[in-house]
Amino acid sequence: MQRPYIESKTFEKADIRDYEDCTFNSCDLSNLNLSGFNFTECEFIRCNMSMAKLSDTTFNEVKFAECKLVALHFEDCNEFLFSVSFDQCQLTLSSFYKRKLKNT
């Protein structure tokens, strides 16, 4: 899969932190600052989000499948509507302190 190439585009006052009903497939999001991002009804498949910053990040009805999620601090996420599910994910050293995990 090739990386998307964006050329001659102007983004002005763009808020690119809100994602709804999106699928992220084989994306490398490791070490990114995802603080304040909002993911609603999204799916991450075979993605690497290891060591990303998640301060006030919203995960609402988000599914992770076969993802590498090492050393994430889910307790830093926005608690309101926090709902995630995991299928065959690597969660080594990730923390869910005081997070309610339904069906997990």
What are these regions, as identified by a protein language model?
Residues M1-T104:
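Tandem repeat scaffolds
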